[in-house]
Amino acid sequence: DLYGNIVLSGGSTMF
């Protein structure tokens, strides 16, 4: 949710 929200536009899969 932290970094995934920035990279995947709201998706904490990898981060």
From Swiss-Prot:
GO terms for molecular function: ATP binding. Induction: By water stress. It is found in: Cytoplasm, Cytoskeleton. The keyword Nucleotide-binding applies. It comes from the Eukaryota. Actins are highly conserved proteins that are involved in various types of cell motility and are ubiquitously expressed in all eukaryotic cells. Belongs to the actin family. This is Actin. The lineage of its organism: Eukaryota, Viridiplantae, Streptophyta, Embryophyta, Tracheophyta.
